[in-house]
C-alpha cells in the first residue's frame, strides 16, 4: 500500500531525524511505532501523509512514487489526502470551521460526497458529539477536540489511518471505543504511541525507532512487548495494564536490538 525507500529527513540546521529508512505497510496491517521522544515518529507519519517530502529517498503509494509537487501538478492531492489521513497529536491544528457540524462536513463536502449528513450523524453519534454539533470547536475540551478531529478523518472513510499519540487527550471509554472500532475493521492503521496497552491491543506489527532515526526492530507486537523486548532509551520500561485487567512487564536492554 505505502512504502518508503531509503528515506532520510532533517529539519534545516538540525541533526538528521530519519536516515535511510525503508519500510512497507501492506493493506489491512495494524502497525505500532515505538521510540523515544525525538526519534522521528511524528516526522515519519507526516512523510507518509505527504505533508513533508524526504530529503533523500522516495515515497510510494500503491506502487507509484509521489511527492507534494507531483500530487499538485496532477490534481491528486485531495484524493490522496482522503485515502491517507493523519490525526495530529494536537488536534487544534486540524480544526478551523465555525461549528462541530461544519468540521465533520468539511472533508466530505470538499470531496463532493453525496451522503454528507449521514456521515455527520454517524460519527457524531459514535463519538458522543451530537449535543455539541452547533458549538464552536474552540469551546470544546481537549478530549472533545481529539474526538472531533478523529471523527473528521473517519468521515472520509480512509484506506490508511495514521494516528499520532491518539490516547493523549481521550478518556478511557473513548480509547476502548477506538480499539474496538479499529481492531475489527479492515482499515490499514499506523499508530505512534507511548501507551503500551493501546499498542498491545491495536497492533499486530511493531516498528521501534532509534534515536539516530533508524529502525531497530520490525516484527510481531507480542515479541516486542514481551520480556526484554523494548528499547530502554524509549522510556517504556514499566508495568502496564491492559483494558481487560492483565498486568504485564516490559524490561528493556539495548543489546537485545543489536
What are these regions (language model features)?
Residues 136-140, 144:
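Conserved ABC ATPase signature
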Residues 213-236:
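Conserved beta-strand-loop-alpha-helix hinge in the C-terminal portion
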Residues 193-194:
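H-loop/switch region of ABC-family ATPase nucleotide-binding domains
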Residues 161-164:
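Catalytic Walker B motif of ABC-type/P-loop ATPase nucleotide-binding domains
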Residues 115-132:
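Conserved ABC ATPase "signature" region
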Residues 57-69, 80:
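Conserved ABC transporter NBD signature motif
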Residues 49:
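Helix-to-loop junction immediately C-terminal to a conserved catalytic motif
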Amino acid at each position: 500500500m505505502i512504502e518508503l525507500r531509503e528515506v532520510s529527513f532533517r529539519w534545516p540546521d538540525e541533526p538528521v531525524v530519519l536516515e535511510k529508512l525503508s519500510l512497507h505497510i501492506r493493506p489491512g496491517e495494524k502497525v505500532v511505532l515505538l521510540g523515544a521522544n525525538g526519534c522521528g515518529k511524528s516526522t515519519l507519519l507526516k512523510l507518509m501523509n505527504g505533508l513533508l517530502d524526504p530529503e533523500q529517498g522516495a515515497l510510494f503509494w500503491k506502487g507509484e512514487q509521489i511527492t507534494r509537487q507531483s500530487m499538485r501538478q496532477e490534481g491528486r492531492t485531495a484524493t490522496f489526502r482522503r485515502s491517507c489521513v493523519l490525526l495530529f497529536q494536537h488536534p487544534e491544528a486540524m480544526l478551523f470551521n465555525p461549528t462541530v457540524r461544519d468540521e465533520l462536513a468539511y472533508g466530505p463536502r470538499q470531496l463532493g460526497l453525496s451522503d454528507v449528513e449521514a456521515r455527520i450523524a454517524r460519527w457524531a453519534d459514535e463519538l458522543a458529539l451530537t449535543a455539541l454539533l452547533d458549538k464552536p470547536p474552540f469551546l470544546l475540551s481537549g478530549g472533545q477536540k481529539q474526538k472531533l478531529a478523529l471523527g473528521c478523518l473517519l468521515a472520509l472513510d480512509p484506506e490508511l489511518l495514521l494516528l499520532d499519540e491518539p490516547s493523549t487527550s481521550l478518556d478511557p471509554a473513548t480509547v476502548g471505543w477506538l480499539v474496538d472500532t479499529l481492531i475489527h475493521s479492515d482499515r490499514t492503521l499506523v499508530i505512534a504511541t507511548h501507551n503500551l496497552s493501546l499498542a498491545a491491543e491495536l497492533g499486530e506489527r511493531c516498528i521501534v525507532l532509534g534515536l539516530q532515526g533508524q529502525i531497530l526492530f520490525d516484527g510481531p507486537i507480542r515479541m516486542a512487548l514481551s520480556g526484554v523486548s523494548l528499547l530502554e532509551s524509549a522510556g517504556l520500561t514499566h508495568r502496564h495494564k491492559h483494558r481487560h485487567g492483565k498486568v504485564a512487564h516490559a524490561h528493556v536492554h539495548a543489546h537485545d536490538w543489536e
